[in-house]
A protein has these predicted regions:
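Transmembrane beta-barrel strands of outer-membrane/channel proteins
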Residues: 69, 78-82, 176-182, 209
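Flexible, solvent-exposed coil segments and beta strand-coil junctions
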Residues: 39-48, 126-138, 184-189
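Outer-membrane beta-barrel "beta-signal"
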Residues: 152, 199-211
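Strand-connecting loop/turn motifs
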Residues: 71-74, 171-173, 200-202
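Extracytoplasmic gating/loop element in the C-terminal half of outer-membrane beta-barrel translocons
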Residues: 9-11, 26, 83-170, 174, ...
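Flexible, surface-exposed loop regions and adjacent strand-edge segments
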Residues: 1-5, 93-103, 108, 189-199
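Repeated loop/turn-to-beta-strand initiation elements of outer-membrane beta-barrel proteins
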Residues: 73-78, 161-162, 203
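Conserved small-residue
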Residues: 1-57
Length: 211
């Protein structure tokens, strides 16, 4: 169920190779696939011979934006990361929702967004459809655009010219710093991190002194 890399002349190594999907059939709850020759078929007949290049994990634009500010001992450094124009195969969404193991706790989407009866327009296939897991199809390829606050640092530098009590402590200078990593994240794709590696923000404080 994971797209495998292919090495074909004229194609990028970052291309995503999957079988084209036309979505979930409202009548049967099965996924409708499009074969390489243009013929429609069901997910039961998925074949590696029908995979085609759809999407590219290499973004068209990516980079960092950095800025610094200082004023009377105060200072700040901030860094942003951007990435636009690429695609991603949402493997975690496939594993944890579409092909969820019902022996364990599952995401609510396993039942709420899944086909249940004829006429349903659903995002995910009928539950345990013929005992087969969903293979690699274009249904799980998503446009990925990201703008992220990578790091933020705010500090105050004290010396004998701007902070009088520094000399009373026998110091020539001191610096208090607050750092924050991944302080915000925006993406067109909801991050499916699972339970093993939950998202976390990092905060640190630092004090540097000079005598």
């Amino acid at each position: 169920d994971t797209p495998l890399p292919r090495y074909e002349e004229g194609e990028s190594l970052s291309r995503i190779w999957v079988v084209r999907s036309l979505g979930i059939d409202p009548a049967s709850g099965d996924e409708i696939l499009l074969k390489r020759n243009g013929e429609m078929t069901s997910a039961v007949n998925w074949s590696a011979n029908d995979v085609v290049p759809i999407g590219n994990t290499e973004p068209k634009w990516q980079g960092y934006i950095n800025s610094s500010f200082t004023y009377k001992g105060w200072g700040a450094d901030v860094s942003f990361r951007y990435q636009f124009g690429g695609q991603v195969y949402n493997q975690t969404l496939l594993d944890k929702v579409e092909n969820a193991n019902l022996k364990y706790n599952v995401d609510r989407r396993v039942t709420q967004l899944r086909w249940a009866k004829p006429g349903d327009k659903a995002q995910f296939r009928v539950l345990n459809h013929k005992g087969l897991e969903t293979k690699a199809t274009s249904r799980f390829i998503m446009d990925e655009n990201i703008f992220q606050g990578s790091s933020l640092s705010v500090y105050y530098r004290m010396d004998r010219t701007n902070t009088k009590f520094i000399s009373h402590w026998g110091l020539s200078s001191a610096k208090v710093t607050f750092n924050m990593e991944d302080f915000f994240y925006w993406s067109t794709v909801k991050r499916e991190r699972g339970l093993y590696y939950p998202y976390s923000r990092q905060f640190t404080f630092a004090l540097n002194v000079a005598f």
